[in-house]
A protein has these predicted regions:
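Short helical patches
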Residues: 172, 176-187
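Long, low-complexity, intrinsically disordered cytosolic termini of multi-pass membrane proteins
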Residues: 183, 187-198
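C-terminal transmembrane helical bundles of large multi-pass transporters
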Residues: 1-176, 198
Length: 198
C-alpha cells in the first residue's frame, strides 16, 4: 500500500474536513429553513440553485485557465451562502404574495418582478467586490484569485438560474400539492359514500 505524506497529505486532510463540514452546514441550513417555512420541500427548492453555482464556478476556472484548488473550494462555500440568500428572498416573497390571496402563478410573476432588482443588486455588489482581486496580477494576490473566481462568477451564473429555477420548482410543488389534495378529497368522498356494513 502507499499514501501521500508531507505537503500532499495536509491538503488532502483539509479537503476531507471541508467537505464534511460543508455537508453538515447544508443539513443545519435545511433544518433552519424547514422550521419557519413549515415545509420539507421549500428548503430543497431554496438549496436547488447551489449546485448550479458550483457549475458556474467550475466553468469560470476552465475559461480563465485557473487550477481548481483548495481556495476554490473556500469560494464555493461562500458562494453557497449568497445563492441560498437570493433564493430565500425570492421564495419568501412568493409565499407572502400567495398568502395575500393571489393565485400561485400571479404570486410568482409578481415576486419575480419585484424581487429581481434586490437579487440583481446583491449579485452585482458581490461580483464587483471580488472583481479587483480577479484581475489582480501581482504575485501576492495570485493565492486568493481562485477563491474570488469561484465566488464572483459562480454567483453570476447562479443568479440567472435562480430567476428561472426557483419559480419553476415552486409552481411544480404547488401543482403537485394541489393534485394530492384533490385525490385525497376523492378518496374521502368515496369512503363516505360507501354504505356501512352492519
Amino acid at each position: 500500500r502507499y499514501g501521500f505524506g508531507g505537503a500532499q497529505r495536509d491538503p488532502a486532510r483539509a479537503l476531507g474536513g471541508l467537505i464534511r463540514g460543508f455537508i453538515r452546514a447544508l443539513f443545519v441550513l435545511y433544518t433552519l429553513l424547514a422550521s419557519p417555512f413549515g415545509s420539507y420541500v421549500e428548503p430543497l427548492i431554496i438549496m436547488a440553485a447551489v449546485p448550479f453555482g458550483f457549475i458556474g464556478a467550475v466553468f469560470s476556472h476552465l475559461f480563465m485557465g485557473i487550477d481548481f484548488g483548495m481556495l476554490s473550494m473556500f469560494g464555493l462555500v461562500g458562494l453557497s451562502g449568497v445563492v441560498v440568500n437570493d433564493s430565500l428572498v425570492l421564495l419568501d416573497f412568493v409565499n407572502a404574495e400567495h398568502q395575500s390571496g393571489k393565485p400561485m402563478d400571479e404570486a410568482i410573476l409578481s415576486a419575480a418582478k419585484i424581487r429581481f432588482r434586490p437579487i440583481l443588486l446583491t449579485t452585482l455588489t458581490t461580483f464587483l467586490g471580488v472583481f479587483p482581486m480577479i484581475i489582480e496580477r501581482s504575485v501576492q494576490a495570485q493565492f486568493l484569485v481562485p477563491m474570488a473566481v469561484s465566488l464572483g462568477f459562480g454567483v453570476l451564473f447562479a443568479t440567472v438560474v435562480i430567476m428561472v429555477l426557483v419559480p419553476a420548482l415552486t409552481m411544480l410543488q404547488h401543482d403537485a400539492l394541489g393534485r394530492f389534495r384533490v385525490r385525497k378529497q376523492r378518496r374521502e368522498a368515496i369512503r363516505q359514500a360507501k354504505p356501512e356494513v352492519a
